[in-house]
Amino acid sequence: MSAVITPADFNDYKVADISLAAWGRRETIIAESEMPALMGLRRKYASEQPLKGAKILGCIHMTIQTAVLIETLVALGAEVRWSSCNIFSTQDQAAASIAAAGIPVFAWKGETEEEYEWCLEQTILKDGQPWDANMILDDGGDLTELLHKKYPQVLDRVHGVTEETTTGVHRLLDMLAKGELKIPAINVNDSVTKSKNDNKYGCRHSLNDAIKRGTDHLLSGKQALVIGYGDVGKGSAQSLRQEGMIVKVSEVDPICAMQACMDGFELVSPFIDGINDGTEASIDKALLGKIDLIVTTTGNVNVCDANMLKALKKRAVVCNIGHFDNEIDTAFMRKNWAWEEVKPQVHKIHRTGAGSFDPQNDDYLILLAEGRLVNLGNATGHPSRIMDGSFANQVLAQIFLFGQKYADLSPAQKAERLTVEVLPKKLDEEVALEMVRGFGGVVTQLTKQQADYIGVTVEGPFKPHAYRY
């Protein structure tokens, strides 16, 4: 898409500065050249228009790459309304370019919590009334939760939700277990072409970038503690190792802990003998007193708690690349310590009390992005080529769920299909193949004899569902 309209033609949006639209359009065109899977889906399904009639409520980081996703959904027939899932992650030029193309969007970098909630509401509402949406695309689950709690009537028309992140999937599974989930969901996060690309390789690229942009620190030779060794933790540990840091890992899952050891990282715990009893006495102060950088990667709560924050080395950098800001106990920091803004999304947290502070005080922590996603708060997130896999999965998931027409089923059929599932492996392989072609790679085709020998078809899928990549 290349059309840019004037603001007078369209006012169903709120962005920081609509005059940034041309800049956003130029960056979007470059991003398209780095997103071969997404652009391949545009070409493949252009005539079929599989999303014609789809009305999608979207809540995901409003970046340049997301602009390519949005315009792909529109190119395949959908109408959308959009907001960002994080108060710091919007690239204002991207939001402006989407608004200038006549697409409703409500997002700007540096929203307050109240403004964030307002943007979510505007995604749902058109002219003050709930839009007749029939699909949801979410990242983290805030939009899905708001619809269930405040606008349940909208869900009567909705065919399903596609969820981008680990945190959002956890929330969906919890709702399903409690009998609260009203619509089926596709777990995009656990598609291989999402989890291995976005969570692992994306973090490998974007974590060190964000820390260096935020602090201008040299990382080489310093000690880092990565909390969690799932796919995000794996990519994060690699990112810091690339910078020459001495990287330690903390993990609760024995399998992930084993992987950290096998990958050559020292497995440690911030707690003596690994036991957190909630007291300062349980903290391994000798360990934390040497840590220059701590990164949370888990999607869990208080994995860097108040007692850990008290024990960290003076002037240590603290950041999160998991999801919400509650991975770090920022609530404790706000209540008990003084905050000094160095620049947007970079704060010195003075551990000398909640009142005034001495600018020359050296007992402080450097907190990035207020504990929210550091790679989107202090930098621009993952590269386009990484997000290509994630967003191609989102498009295929939207097509898949929209085609299932859940809202039109009988109650008995709905009960049977009310699930949280991953995309079929064949679609995962379709995304991967488009990405490989984008790299100029050539995939070898099985012979009929070889396919028969391992019990698959020549066209795939090539691995059983339980295969761990």
Curated annotation (Swiss-Prot):
Its cofactor is NAD(+). Substrate binds at residues 63, 139, 164, 194, 198. It catalyses: S-adenosyl-L-homocysteine + H2O = L-homocysteine + adenosine. Keywords: Cytoplasm, Hydrolase, NAD, One-carbon metabolism. PROSITE patterns: ADOHCYASE_1, ADOHCYASE_2. InterPro entries: Adenosylhomocyst_ase-like_sf, Adenosylhomocysteinase-like, Ado_hCys_hydrolase_NAD-bd, NAD(P)-bd_dom_sf, S-Ado-L-homoCys_hydrolase_CS. Signal peptide: none annotated. Binds 1 NAD(+) per subunit. SMART domains: AdoHcyase (SM00996), AdoHcyase_NAD (SM00997). Pfam families: AdoHcyase, AdoHcyase_NAD. GO terms for cellular component: cytosol. One of its GO terms (molecular function) is adenosylhomocysteinase activity. GO terms for biological process: L-homocysteine biosynthetic process; one-carbon metabolic process; S-adenosylmethionine cycle. It comes from the Bacteria. NAD(+) binds at residues 165-167, 199, 228-233, 251, 300, 321-323, 375. Its EC number is 3.13.2.1. Pathway: Amino-acid biosynthesis; L-homocysteine biosynthesis; L-homocysteine from S-adenosyl-L-homocysteine: step 1/1. PANTHER family: ADENOSYLHOMOCYSTEINASE. May play a key role in the regulation of the intracellular concentration of adenosylhomocysteine. Belongs to the adenosylhomocysteinase family. This is Adenosylhomocysteinase. It comes from Pseudomonas fluorescens (strain Pf0-1).
